[in-house]
Design a protein with these regions (language model features):
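Acidic/glycine-enriched connector segments
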Residues: 2-144
Length: 150
């Protein structure tokens, strides 16, 4: 999606998460993302909100489809692997966070072993952004103010 103007940061959600090939229980993983959006947008107008994601198969594209179905504007920011090589992921992650979202949502079944999702979460925390993390065998943590062993 091409954007003609910068969205209001108080209405921006950044999503990061696990790659599709690594998700063990797709049905429950998708349900977790749906539940997040339903809770976050309860009694709000979804069309006023923008989702920014990193265009990765898995959590990013699941969240993008769910957000689109709910009526949010969806913006994908892909990593430029050809231009930046291995640095492309972290560069893309920082670009997403520079929109200063009101929340960064991370969906991962094992975030401590993650590279990309963990990089986004740690960078967001360093930027003093609100981060919501959900992963298997741990309740959603709400707003994180420390890296919780990430």
């Amino acid at each position: 999606v091409c954007v003609s103007s910068i969205p209001d940061s108080s209405k921006i959600i950044v999503v990061t998460g696990q790659r599709g090939s690594q998700i063990r229980d797709v049905k429950n993983f998708r349900a977790m993302i749906v539940s997040f959006f339903e809770s976050l947008l309860f009694e709000k107008n979804p069309s006023e909100y923008t989702l920014i994601h990193g265009c990765c198969n898995g959590a990013d594209l699941m969240a993008a489809q769910i957000a689109s179905d709910l009526g949010l504007t969806v913006i994908g920011i892909p990593a430029d692997w050809t231009r930046y090589g291995r640095a492309a992921g972290p560069i893309r992650n920082r670009l997403m966070l520079e929109y200063k979202p009101f929340i960064v949502a991370a969906f991962h079944e094992d975030i401590k072993s993650s590279k990309g999702t963990k990089n986004t979460v740690v960078t967001a925390l360093e930027m003093d952004l609100v981060v919501w993390v959900s992963w298997k065998n741990k309740n959603p943590s709400g707003s994180l103010k420390d890296s919780e062993g990430l």
